[in-house]
Amino acid sequence: MATLITGGAGFVGLEVARQLLDAGETEITVFSRNPSSGRLGDLADRVNAVAGDVGNFSHVLDVVKATRPEVIYHLGAMLTVPSDADPASAIQTNAMGTFYVLEAARLFEARQVIFSSSIGSYGRNIEGETLNDTTLQRPTMFYG
């Protein structure tokens, strides 16, 4: 099964790739701004690495068209400090990038898109709460 991981050279993306490989998946593409072999480490020769920007629709279309994934793990995003420093770029990458991934998935008939967010979207004062799909999100930073 072909799998695409946006943000695939990030901390979570690399762990998802590792878990998929350990489960027997063999056709994994990591899509990231800097998917260098140094960044990918021991996964460099086990995944297809594609450089690109999730906030650029052409880049997203190209990688989805080329790889025809059945499943897309959408993990690519700008993190807290850069998002707060440059809100316009954060909107382009995080909001529009998500739209671009969903639209490319629709156009090229990916079976599933799995999206992972951040604890930053829930804000403060959530200790002890069980987080689920109905948990109120109260971000305190632009990133959230």
Language-model features: locations:
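NAD(P)-cofactor binding segment of oxidoreductase domains
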Residues: 14, 18, 85-114
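Rossmann-fold cofactor-recognition segment
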Residues: 44-56
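N-terminal Rossmann NAD(P)H-binding glycine-rich loop of SDR-like oxidoreductase domains
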Residues: 2-23
